[in-house]
Curated annotation (Swiss-Prot):
One of its GO terms (cellular component) is nucleus. It catalyses: D-sedoheptulose 7-phosphate + D-glyceraldehyde 3-phosphate = D-erythrose 4-phosphate + beta-D-fructose 6-phosphate. It comes from Drosophila melanogaster (Fruit fly). Belongs to the transaldolase family. Type 1 subfamily. Pfam families: TAL_FSA (PF00923). Keywords: Cytoplasm, Pentose shunt, Schiff base, Transferase. InterPro entries: Aldolase_TIM (IPR013785), TAL/FSA (IPR001585), Transaldolase_1 (IPR004730), Transaldolase_AS (IPR018225). This is Probable transaldolase. One of its GO terms (biological process) is carbohydrate metabolic process.
Length: 331
């Protein structure tokens, strides 16, 4: 009996098994939670920064950002903008103290249709990181996968050596455009695709391997590896651990602390579903997308159109909430 207990103790958790074949990323701004699960990288977004900024233990960071902004001349709205940028960078800097890899910092969602301003904002964030002693190699600038966002990423990568993470990615057309732009990494969403199919079709439950979000990421991964694109695929937005396990082998998976905990508590063998060798065997046609084709294909995809616009709106709403929170400190 004692030996059975010893065996159970020695058996690796699903999270440990996954770490052998996939880079695990923590999807949170709560860097104390990140420290528990020892991921390689971390991702943040406006909603996660808002959530963390509302926690008592992170008030000193908010105060620090506000003090920084007060030292800048300008109107209240300009000071709020300064505080917002600095706060995102402060969170990123703290996160980098507990992860060995990179952190993703997101561009204001309200710039999703402005290439020039997205580039300017990204370079400002990179400069702020540099002022705090953080090298740009440890930063991924997150941009929405609009045509304008993808073009901004292309400029940042090619002209400034800034690595980009293209988020709110729901369609194959978006993925192809990102690969052709040569971005460092994409974050195709899984759970939000599932949400759309549950809400808009008669099927309310999907097995993990038949989950439309899992299928979407699998198709993108296979396409990238088949044709030798350097862009990495980081599955994101998970609703359950089944989706995560069905994407074992993906370049990276970014996972919330709640689901990381579930994976840590499970012990079972992990099957590698995604691999370069298997992708090379797939019968896939190579396509190319210019702006008009990108817009047409996106428009033809009701799910992707809905979810991209909804995602941008949600991040914009949470950005405004964070601005309002900062305003209370500036008064």
């Amino acid at each position: 009996m004692g030996s059975d207990r010893t065996l159970k103790k020695q058996k690796m958790s699903v999270l440990q098994e996954l770490k052998k074949i996939t880079t695990i990323v923590a999807d949170t701004g709560d860097f104390e939670a990140i420290n528990i699960y020892k991921p390689t990288d971390a991702t943040t977004n406006p909603s996660l920064i808002l959530s963390a900024s509302s926690m008592e233990r992170y008030q000193p960071l908010v105060q620090k950002a506000v003090e920084y902004a007060k030292g800048k001349k300008g109107s209240v709205s300009e000071q709020v903008a300064e505080a917002m940028d600095y706060l995102c960078v402060l969170f990123g800097t703290e996160i980098l103290k507990v992860v060995p890899g990179r952190v993703s910092t997101e561009i204001d969602a309200r710039l999703s249709f402005d290439t020039k301003k997205s580039v300017e904002k990204a370079l400002k964030l990179i400069a702020l990181y540099k002022s705090l002693g953080v090298d740009k190699e440890r930063i991924l600038i997150k941009l929405a996968s609009t045509w304008e966002g993808i073009k901004a990423a292309e400029i940042l990568e090619n002209e400034h050596g800034v690595h980009c993470n293209l988020t709110l990615l729901f369609s194959f057309a978006q993925a192809v455009a990102c690969a052709e732009a040569g971005v460092t990494l994409i974050s195709p969403f899984v759970g939000r695709i599932l949400d759309w199919y549950v809400a808009n079709t008669d099927t309310k439950k999907f097995e993990a391997l038949k989950d439309p979000g899992v299928i979407s990421v699998t198709n993108i991964y296979n396409y990238y590896k088949k044709f030798g694109y350097k862009t990495l695929v980081m599955g994101a937005s998970f609703r359950n651990v089944g989706e995560i396990k069905a994407l074992a082998g993906c370049d990276l998976l970014t996972i919330s602390p709640a689901l990381l905990k579930e994976l840590e508590n499970e012990t079972e063998s992990v099957v590698t579903y995604l691999s370069v060798s298997n992708a090379k065997l797939q019968d896939i046609e190579k396509i190319t997308v210019d702006e008009s084709r990108f817009r047409w294909l996106l428009n033809e995809d009701a799910m992707a159109t809905d979810k991209l616009s909804e995602g941008i709106r949600k991040f914009a709403v949470d950005t405004v909430k964070l601005e309002n929170l900062i305003k209370t400190y500036l008064k």
